[in-house]
Amino acid sequence: MRSVRAYVGLGANLGDPAATLEAGIAALAALPGVRLRGVSRLYATRPVGIRAQPDFRNAVVALDVPAGPDPTTGAIALLVALKGLERAFGRRTRERWGPRELDLDLLVFGRARLAVERPPEGVSLDRGKADRLLVVPHRDAAERLFVLAPLADLAPGLAPPGWGHTVDWARRRREAVEGPEAVRAIATWNAATRAWTPL
């Protein structure tokens, strides 16, 4: 089966978010045909949009996933799996930028550049978010330090399609805007124990 390298962002700020991300990574690795290839450091990050909520924990994973017969089919299949996992972890429809039990975002899917309609089982769980398109690379990733910092841990030299620059360049640019205190690495992934090791 042909595979493609995908990058998925994870975030949570309800309950024990670090433990939730550990369980989320295990669930991603257990998806059919998926191989876990890398896990970023764990970051403590300030909320975006709605400030009156707990800080988030964010990470990014590198996955080899089934490519599908074409990039659109492969990306949609992964999206549907991600949304299914969100629901399995208790994610409910909430306001956009609000608290999350578990948030899984498809950031990059190989060299694909897509803007396709989401199937019903792949729609966003953000209340009031009218966008029904799956956009790959993720349309907001280049402007979110909480995505760029962990993504740069895994693929600093990656230039996602349409960006015109590398992940590390985008990370440094956003850090200059948001300040280095906006995201803080707090743990590394221990592949042997499949858990975070505090820094």
Indicate residue ranges for each PLM-predicted region.
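Nucleotide and nucleotide-moiety/phosphate-recognizing core
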Residues: 1-8, 14-101, 109-112
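Flexible, gly/pro- and Lys/Arg-enriched active-site loops
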Residues: 48-56, 76-199
